[in-house]
Regions:
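Conserved small/aromatic sequence motifs within transmembrane helices
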Residues: 1-134
Length: 134
């Protein structure tokens, strides 16, 4: 990923970023708004380590934390992670772990070609327009 936060942003350990987090630089706000901070992960898609669409991978610290706080959160780790997903186009950075899980599980259990086309088009619109997620 591209760096969107100031250096030493996590000097006190991993922290979940808020939408208006003061650790996010001005350039970081732009790359997050357009989601281009995710583009380096296209390499992971080409290598087969990620898919284009699927639940976004979380850092191990957050998976452990959220799995202990949100029943079923670890289930989203059972599928190949994706560069973009239903949770990202429905709420992006504003979602709580519970909300993210709801969208990820909907994609995992009810995903279809039409849903993938919808996610792809919405993702492209976010990148082109910079209009976040909703």
């Amino acid at each position: 990923k591209l760096r969107s936060m100031c250096k030493n942003a996590e000097k006190n350990g991993a922290q979940w970023a808020d939408k208006d987090d003061d650790r996010i630089t001005n350039v970081g706000k732009f790359i997050r708004k357009t989601r281009i901070d995710e583009l380096p992960q296209l390499i992971n898609v080409v290598k087969g380590e990620m898919s284009f669409i699927g639940p976004r991978p979380e850092r191990p610290e957050f998976v452990e934390l959220f799995s202990s706080e949100v029943i079923g959160f670890e289930q989203r780790c059972l599928v190949t992670p994706g560069l973009t997903g239903l949770a990202q186009i429905q709420g992006g950075y504003d979602l709580t772990p519970q909300q993210k899980l709801k969208y990820d599980m909907k994609y995992i259990h009810k995903g279809s070609l039409m849903m993938e086309l919808y996610i792809s088009i919405r993702t492209l619109m976010v990148v082109i327009t910079g209009e976040g997620s909703r």
